[in-house]
């Protein structure tokens, strides 16, 4: 009986402590909702920045709470929170919509330090406008290619983990972009953005033969909407089978003629593969003369491409058979809501 009472008291203490921790996190969450709503609705850029700074402070307060990695923050509207399945990485991102229709990008990461057995948090500093050839660079938290992330995908190569992020970045009044970013986390929780895990040698948008991309940046018109998400879809793979040439004798009306021979043509085999993959619209210019003028790039109607995780890389497959319904959640078509995307 005494043992039962003691266990009940211990359980009550832990429940009370958990409730207190959650009440603190609830208060931080409510404040973030209020500040972010005010930031988006404000017509004063200085006030927008001040409110964003307050949001940053609250996010850091959340990450400092023990076991906050498990706390549900899906109620946040303007601050997107993505958490890896292994609960070792979390990223917060939001956008400051300035009055001149440009954007500021803010982010904070929470990652696990294996040595100290605790989480560490880092502020991300956007340098996207100053980075030349950003697609080919590994970047640090102080040189972040800022974006609003709306999807996280976890993959592995041996013991090395990759967190692939799908995101949005507004570039100008006429050009926006969708991004496929790759994050790696070191043993001490240090964050690196960008990694060469893309097999896109036949991807015309990035130039055939491309082997150096560490992130993919898809630029297109603000008047269009590009679908980019992680879906369960079908790929039809074609391959030529190598077979030994057989020789068929043909009749000759003249004796002494060598028998003519004709090799068999290579047979094309196809197989359907159904799996989760990154699914995306194909972007094309309105005319060949508009190549590389991204304000004239739009999704091609009814042509869907994909990136499938194969042999530790995201391998490009063109024109997939996208018969399965695509995800309607995660705002994959237009991730920034509430008039944050330029019309």
Identify the role of each PLM range.
Residues 1-31:
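Bacterial Sec-dependent N-terminal signal peptides
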Residues 88-95, 161-169, 276-282:
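Short beta-strand elements that form the blades of beta-propeller/WD-repeat-like
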Residues 107-157:
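Short N-terminal edge-element motif at the start of the domain
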Residues 119-128, 192-201, 316-322:
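Beta-propeller fold detector
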Residues 135-144, 148-157, 171, 192-309, ...:
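Short aromatic loop motif centered on NTY/YTY
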Residues 305, 312-343:
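Gram-negative outer-membrane assembly/targeting C-terminal domains
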